[in-house]
Amino acid sequence: MYLTASSSASSSIIRAASSRSSSLFSFRSVLSPSVSSTSPSSLLARRSFGTISPAFRRWSHSFHSKPSPFRFTSQIRAVSPVLDRLQRTFSSMASEHPFKGIFTTLPKPGGGEFGKFYSLPALNDPRVDKLPYSIRILLESAIRNCDNFQVTKEDVEKIIDWEKTSPKQVEIPFKPARVLLQDFTGVPAVVDLACMRDAMNKLGSDSNKINPLVPVDLVIDHSVQVDVARSENAVQANMELEFQRNKERFAFLKWGSTAFQNMLVVPPGSGIVHQVNLEYLGRVVFNTKGLLYPDSVVGTDSHTTMIDGLGVAGWGVGGIEAEATMLGQPMSMVLPGVVGFKLAGKMRNGVTATDLVLTVTQMLRKHGVVGKFVEFYGNGMSGLSLADRATIANMSPEYGATMGFFPVDHVTLQYLKLTGRSDETVAMIEAYLRANNMFVDYNEPQQDRVYSSYLELNLDDVEPCISGPKRPHDRVTLKEMKADWHSCLDSKVGFKGFAIPKEAQEKVVNFSFDGQPAELKHGSVVIAAITSCTNTSNPSVMLGAGLVAKKACDLGLQVKPWIKTSLAPGSGVVTKYLLKSGLQEYLNEQGFNIVGYGCTTCIGNSGEINESVGAAITENDIVAAAVLSGNRNFEGRVHPLTRANYLASPPLVVAYALAGTVNIDFETEPIGKGKNGKDVFLRDIWPTTEEIAEVVQSSVLPDMFRATYESITKGNPMWNKLSVPENTLYSWDPNSTYIHEPPYFKDMTMDPPGPHNVKDAYCLLNFGDSITTDHISPAGNIQKDSPAAKFLMERGVDRKDFNSYGSRRGNDEIMARGTFANIRIVNKLMNGEVGPKTVHIPSGEKLSVFDAAMRYKSSGEDTIILAGAEYGSGSSRDWAAKGPMLQGVKAVIAKSFERIHRSNLVGMGIIPLCFKSGEDADTLGLTGHERYTIHLPTDISEIRPGQDVTVTTDNGKSFTCTVRFDTEVELAYFNHGGILPYVIRNLSKQ
């Protein structure tokens, strides 16, 4: 039988709660004794599939915040054979919600009610009043979803007692309100869901059980490339090429939007996922059939954190973790510490939000916030616009935090109105958050909140700056930039070094560009891109860039024609206000024509640079530069030929494009010669804060947001012409090079395989620090001599049609070949040789990483990876775990892991191990030429989260590592060979 949303047990919860006793009592009186969720029998049961079943969210999801051509209304039918089995047990739980005593009505001013909600103040517990606002969202979710089954009263108590429990690394379940996807990560997610349906079929179960049970929004934004720039026709030309390359992927996603319930797909050309989420999709407060609760979201993109600026709890997770969340599996997470970041004062004239976020990133990176929430507060908050806050929240992955959270205040409400949310919706949001003590009013005295640690920044101290040349947290002030650049040229190859000999540093390369003389030097800018949701969501810096362009035009400055300039807004709203202000005209004159609505250069979709420019760089070993308003600048990410990549505000992107080089001191050196040969300095073209505020006030209007988003799901003619089958099971084309059935569930049975042995494994790769997911699974161009290129050419794909690795993530055969294919990767086994190769230890041959991995795999040999600190930092890229798994990697031993990547490794059945503090491969004398045995118990009941394990080598070395299975649920996943097999077996048993 199936229960529809209207007939589900949730209605009985509401009915029972509405007749609750009017008396309010303390939290401790709500709790009743029950079996501990951490008892040995409970833990053992959790590791088998019989006890943990997915959550069945029974609320229908409707979004009423603004006029819209559609509603987010689920047509969910909860997968419910399990309810037949547990009906008698759950019937009493449904009518007797553990917290029915705090379920109350939120009245409307003037009569009526907004709905009902679980009241945190009604707990009458003083500990709640001191909780950080971000933790209150976790608390409300736990209370609302408490069923003493998936979420227990003990879990609720852990969160309430956060001050004492968070230092102990306790585990809690969390059930986000929705899931957010983009197409690079969304395609493999939908591929996995389709493959899971097939697996359910093969196991004799109902394939329709594989359906999202929470709202899923997928925005197609990662596919557009800057093939055409500096042209009025660039948007249309790039979109046509985008559809030519990605027609099959887009049709697959369109099929997914019809085959899977509760899934919305926003067509290409609409904007960047995080900006669309901020301006439109974000609810702040859900009103679902009269039940009010805070919006929360997990997304398959690490910059999902941008929504934290709106007061919505959100962060990035791996694709496989998101898939489990879609299917009702609660997320298991360690209750995080919260860093309180106090902002004081006000930014000086001419300083931008980008300067602020780069400063904050450097401070937090130094403080150490991995696995923690950061919550901003202080009197400096009142001077930050919502867009400024979103910029800071966006870069949470760059400073290492799970979230960079800004509680809702009056600035948030003003932004909601600006972006077209209805007055009634905003009134409901404010009333709910005030009633539940989740609203901050900086005009009122602030109650002290407890944080795990504290930081403070006086906004007066923020200086204009950029970050680079290879990492987002390597901030350089503008006044120090020239000296820092020369230091980078001098220093040995590393994060801040290129090792260019002194005698070669002033080299000038002359070449011909379109028949005109041109020249390049070390530091010459060849790409200047206003890109990324980080900054294009912020009208002040976008209009500031337009003002810089206007002043430059007025003074007679012009960007050199061989610099590839581009502007890619995160939503159509940006185009509207740039046109209304009249500033787009001047950006066009400087070459910053709009090229498309998507991520573009920020994720490596910068397109080709001119052949003559490329030849001048490669033939003369020039360290060319890219300057972009993005959030990441890791090696090889922006473009293969730009070894120096700097993050800057949009106005500075225009300024550096005008200067043509990063080798400049803007305070003392002119940008160029203007009219009549007069020197023009940065100060001559830099707008004042008042100038920017004036144009923002006159040009950014609510009607622009309404007009843009009323038509966002209608698509364009190319999207609407895509025809898709109506089948709920996907018909795999074995010859497709975009969509391929992955082998994850091949030969799968109902019996969990248990922990796998790692005995006498070879080291596939030996890495140093800061190996990113871009190194592990690049998203950009497919190099012509790579294993992936060979695979495509063997199947008749021309080089011009290779597309990017990111666009090929629906094909496991290509992605396995693209794993560790970054051309800038440094493997210690190669003794200084840079590139995607390794040594096959038994033969001593130098091979591509893929070829070596396949040789090990074909001979039945396990492999492991050695790594340094921050392994897997960067994008939340599940292929950085899927790829190694398909290559046969059984374990990664590192000094430390980035949060999302560690979770992804666990999700794919790979063992993450950490060296003990003060130790690493070098200090232990490990070269990677040894064979490794990991002495992990083969009985899952004998493994504990975070336990120590001994690793031995064939040459007699022995050392201790910490197993980074952090929770009991992760051990259950490991027992099943990964999270997806675990979910399939669970659903098949019901």
Curated annotation (Swiss-Prot):
Processing and modification events after translation: Phosphorylated at Ser-91 in the cytoplasm; this phosphorylation requires the presence of B'GAMMA.
Keywords carried by this UniProt record: 4Fe-4S, Cytoplasm, Glyoxylate bypass, Iron, Iron-sulfur, Lyase, Metal-binding, Mitochondrion, Phosphoprotein, Transit peptide, Tricarboxylic acid cycle
Gene that this polypeptide is encoded by: ACO3
Reaction catalyzed: citrate = D-threo-isocitrate
Cofactor annotation comment: Binds 1 [4Fe-4S] cluster per subunit.
GO cellular component: chloroplast; chloroplast stroma; cytoplasm; cytosol; mitochondrion; plant-type cell wall; plant-type vacuole
Entry binding sites for [4Fe-4S] cluster: C533, C599, C602
Name of the protein in question: Aconitate hydratase 3, mitochondrial
Function statement: Catalyzes the isomerization of citrate to isocitrate via cis-aconitate. Contributes to oxidative stress tolerance. Modulates cytosolic citrate metabolism during lipid mobilization. Required during seedling growth.
Entry EC number(s): 4.2.1.3
Listed GO MF terms: 4 iron, 4 sulfur cluster binding; aconitate hydratase activity; ATP binding; copper ion binding
